C-alpha cells in the first residue's frame, strides 16, 4: 500500500528525520494510530518469536508493548481502524472503493471520457454528489492529454490480492481491550483508516499519524514510522515538498500515479519514474552541505524571503511543472540558501531555536532540556500548524488533463475525494473542516480482565498480560482535555 517507491526514496535521500517528540511537562502529544497497519508489523515480528501463542495472546503481547511505549513517550494515541469498531462495516469510500466502482462503471477508455469525474461524497461531506465538487473544476489544462508515462495508460480489473503470511491478529479482541481500557478511538465506519487519520491530522486534532503507509504523505500528513526507537523516525510532507521544490497541489497531481491501491496489476508508476519524466534532479552536494550547516547553526539571523517571480497576468493557465524544473536546472531560480526555513523543518521536531531538543546529539536519556525551551518549541509548532492549513488542494486539478482513460478517471476521482477530506470549506467569514467524532469509553478494568481471561485460557499467560496492562498502561486522560491543552494553551 502507499506510494510505490516513496519509502525507499525517503531513506535514500535522507528525508526520514529522527525526533525526540519531547512535549513540555504536563502535555501529551496526540497521535493518530493506523491500528491494523501498526499491529500487523508487530504481529509479524513477534509471532515468530512466540510460536506457541494463539491469536489473542500474540495480539495482546503486541498491544502491551505498544501501550507501554505510548506511556513512556507521553504520546496520546487515538486509534483508527478499518471496517468500524465491530470489524464488520463494508468500506465504501476511499481508494479501493473508487477503483472498484469506476472499473465496474466503465469497461473501456472510451466510456471513461463521458463519465462524471466526481466520486461519491465522503461521510464528512455535507453535499450531494452533484454539487459537492462544483468548486473544483479545472480552470485550464497545463499538461496535454496523452503525455502521461506508460504506467497506468489503462486500468485492468482488480486481481486477487497477493497472498500474505498467516497472521495471528485478533482484530475484534484488540479493539474490545482498547475500549475497555478507556483509550480514545475513531469509529471510521465505511471509511478507510488512512482517510480517517488524514481528517484527524488536517483538523489539527493530532500532531502525527503513526503508520508505514506512505499514501498519508500524498494526503499532506506527517507520519511516524516507529515509536519504539529512541529517536522516532518521521517523514514530514513539507520536507518532501521543499526537497522536490513543488507545491502540494503539484505533488498530489503528479504522485497520484504511484498510489498502489488505485492501479491494479502493477500499472502504477514509481516515485523515481515520475521524477525522471519531470527531469527532476536532486539538490547538489553543496546545497546539501549548506542545508546541514543551517540545521546546526543557532546564531544565524533571519532574512526576508525574496518574492517569487509573479505569474503572467491575464491567463488562468498554470506554468507546467517541466518548465519550472528546466529553469531550476538551468539556474533560472535563485538557490534557497538565503531563504529562512521553518524552524520545524531544520530541527526535525517542534519549532524553536536551531539548537532544538529534537536534534540527534546525544542519547535521549542524557539530554536535559529546560521545560521553558520545550514550551517555546511547542507553541511555535502549534502556530506553524495553524498557518500551514492546505487551502490550495483543489488546484491539483489544474495540473491534470481531462480524464480520457479509466486510469485517469480513477485518479481524478481520488484527488477530488482527497480534497473533500482535507480541504476546508468556506462558510461565510469562516473556514471550516468537519472532524470525525472521537469516542472514549469509561475505563473498566473488570471488563478488560473478563475479555482477556475469556479469550486467553492459559491462566499464567493471562495474568502476566493483565499485570503488564495494570502497570504499563495507566488510565488515559480524557481526550478533550489533552487536545485543549496541546492546541489551545
Swiss-Prot record:
Keyword tags: Decay of host mRNAs by virus, Endonuclease, Eukaryotic host gene expression shutoff by virus, Host gene expression shutoff by virus, Host mRNA suppression by virus, Host-virus interaction, Hydrolase, Inhibition of host innate immune response by virus, Interferon antiviral system evasion, Late protein, Nuclease, RNA-binding, Viral immunoevasion, Virion
Effect of residue 194 to N: No effect on human eIF4H binding
Transmembrane feature ranges: none
EC number: 3.1.27.-
Compositionally biased residues, Polar residues: 124-134
SUPFAM superfamilies linked: PIN domain-like (SSF88723)
Principal location: virion
Effect listed in the UniProt record for changing residue 82 to N: No effect on human eIF4H binding
Family affiliation: Belongs to the herpesviridae VHS protein family.
Descriptive protein name: Virion host shutoff protein
